[in-house]
Each structure stands twice: as C-alpha cells, then as structure tokens.
Amino acid sequence: MKMIRRQALSLLAGLAAAVTLPLGGMAQAQTMPAPLDNPGEVKIALVRYLSTGDFFQAYLSGVEQQAKALGVDLRVFDSRQDAALQADMVDQAIALGVDGIIIQHGLTESMQEAAQRAVDAGIKVVAFDVNVENKAIPQVEQSDYLLGKLALEQA
C-alpha cells in the first residue's frame, strides 16, 4: 500500500494532464507515471465544479478513459456549480478513504479549506483550473486567452 500512495501523486498529475491532450495539445505530460503494483486498490476522486458543455464532457471522458487504462477505481463527484456542495464532496471523498483527489475548477474561497483537509488526511491532491493557494497541491492550469488565440489562428 505504501508504494501505491507514493505513486498516487504521479497518477493524479498524469490523469489531469492526459485529459488536456485531446483538447488541443497545449499541455503535455513530461513523463508517464510508473505502473502500479495493485492498480485496483487505488481510489481516485474527481470532484467537479463545472460539468456542462463540450469541454467538460471531453474532460470527464478523458479522465474515465485514463482511469480505465490504468485500472484504478475512479469516483466522480459533480457539484453542478454549487461551491458549498463541492467542498462537502471533497469531505465525502476523504471519508471514503481515497488515495487521491482531483479538484476540477471551483472557487478558491470554498476549496482552500477542503483541499487542506484532504492534505491533512494524507491524501494526494491535484487542482485543475482552480487556485487553492496551497504549495503542497500541484496546480494544472490552462490559459483561456492562449487557447482562444490558437483557435482563431487555426480558423
């Protein structure tokens, strides 16, 4: 189990980075995470703030495909733009004993304390497009400006 926990952060970063590749290739994972000894024992929670629209459906599809390819147990929590519910869902993921949490979007004010509770519980956390203002949590972000500029250049 110790080996699994050490690899959870690499897995989370890989999942978060992998889903952005089909969306324009702007972000690329530098290295793939090492294979897991017992991937079925790894539980990852994706806690979403935004879920409607093509981008968010493609993002979810990418996370699900990557989790399936790695053989990990993925739990998806969808707060539907309810900041308090998203924070509660992080707490639910902590209670489930997940190995890692991907926080997808959200509000800094509501996610800061929830993310810290996960870190305090020994859970690896990655934040995608939400600044939780925590040096222990890797941030995966994209520039909407640069994506828009690229789209216009390719049109």
Give the positions of each predicted feature.
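Extracytoplasmic "Venus flytrap"
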Residues: 33-62, 66, 70, 74-88, ...
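Hydrophobic alpha-helical segments within soluble ligand-binding/sensing domains
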Residues: 37-38, 86, 140-155
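Boundary at the C-terminal end of the N-terminal hydrophobic targeting segment
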Residues: 27-31
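Flexible loop/hinge segments that line or gate small-molecule binding clefts
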Residues: 108-146, 150
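Bacterial N-terminal signal peptides
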Residues: 12-22
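N-terminal secretory signal peptides and thylakoid transit peptides that target proteins
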Residues: 2-14
